[in-house]
Amino acid sequence: MRKRISAIIMTLFMVLVSCNSGGVAEDPQSKFLKSVIDLGNDFLNVFTSFGDIVSKVLGFSTETKKSDVGAYFKTIQDTIQGTKDKLNKIVTDMKREGNPNASATETAVKTLIDNTLDKIIEGAKTVSDAIGDASDPIANVAAQNAAGAAGTEVDKLVKGIKTIVDVVLKGVGSANAGDDKKAEDGNTARTAAAGDGEAGKLFTAGAGAAGDANNAKKVAADAAKAVGAVTGADILQAMIKDNGDAAKLATAQNAGAAPKDGAIAGGIALRVMAKGGKFAGPSAAADDAVTAIKGAAISAITKALDTLTIAIRKTIDAGLKTVKEAMKINANDTPISPEQNTPKATTNN
């Protein structure tokens, strides 16, 4: 009997609240709780929207165009901009609602935007603009007896990637990773001027620079060895090193010293991205070698951008957690609607 009475009282209470909601101003405490719930939902949306980047696998292949890489960086730019806009909206809403944590949240958001988001946006835009609408394939190898090409705006690629890497991968990876040994025997060092059978021949100007079928296979094997010996972070660090061997190779310059695996892999990744960039081809028919060169090129760019994507995500997540702490909400909880918080009357037959 007592349970029935409790249920009736609860039902009457809910009816009363429902009736008052139409003509009486919302209770300040209820309004604040609803505001917190809304903030939680907004915050979850920030995490979800940024997670869309990671969910899109970089399925690069021999059919992938350089413009697709540019589109990847444009996606990074747009998504981070969206994250920035949503965070600013949260701060605006908190101020409007008189949330006591608005000031602390505004400070945390400003720090995240100034030190991280704006720099990633800037770097991604620089890279995307440098690649533009380049329709040539990423694994672009010159035809038999044809010359390779450095492509254009490699300096802007380096600048843009550096702007991002300095934020999300500072101190991670090494531009000098790997060794300078040729794949042919694992003991003989490469040469600064790129001798026959060395991966450096891929960047050499001149028709058929990769050599005859036999040497072209060695070149391909050395390139594959270099890419396989280093991490994505190593490749990225090699790409952005000031006056580094990777950038020199990518622009068809003499590295000045026997290039290590990291420099070779970084140079390959830059040549892959550069508008008009093309690897030197063989001087004779060497289909197997060309296929292997393309494979090394795809592997290098995939390694680099996979690592970059994950690093961006981790960096943003860490920044968002700082904002969450300032907001005094648990971003790990699934936000719920006000209706889900409303107690329901129960009956006991």
Swiss-Prot record:
Compartment list: Cell outer membrane
Keyword Lipoprotein in record: yes
Lipidation (N-palmitoyl cysteine): C19
Gene Ontology cellular component terms for the protein in this record: cell outer membrane
Membrane topology designation: Lipid-anchor
Keywords, comma-separated and alphabetical: Cell outer membrane, Lipoprotein, Membrane, Palmitate, Plasmid, Signal
Lipidation (S-diacylglycerol cysteine): C19
Residues in the signal sequence: 1-18
UniProt keyword Nucleus present: no
Principal location class: membrane
InterPro entries documented for this protein: Borrelia_lipo
Top-level division of the source organism's lineage: Bacteria
Note: Genes for both Vlp and Vsp families are on (usually) unnamed linear plasmids in B.hermsii HS1.
Purpose: The Vlp and Vsp proteins are antigenically distinct proteins, only one vlp or vsp gene is transcriptionally active at any one time. Switching between these genes is a mechanism of host immune response evasion.
Family from the record: Belongs to the variable large protein (Vlp) family. Gamma subfamily.
Entry protein name: Variable large protein 19
Species the sequence originates in: Borrelia hermsii
Taxonomic classification: Bacteria, Pseudomonadati, Spirochaetota, Spirochaetia, Spirochaetales
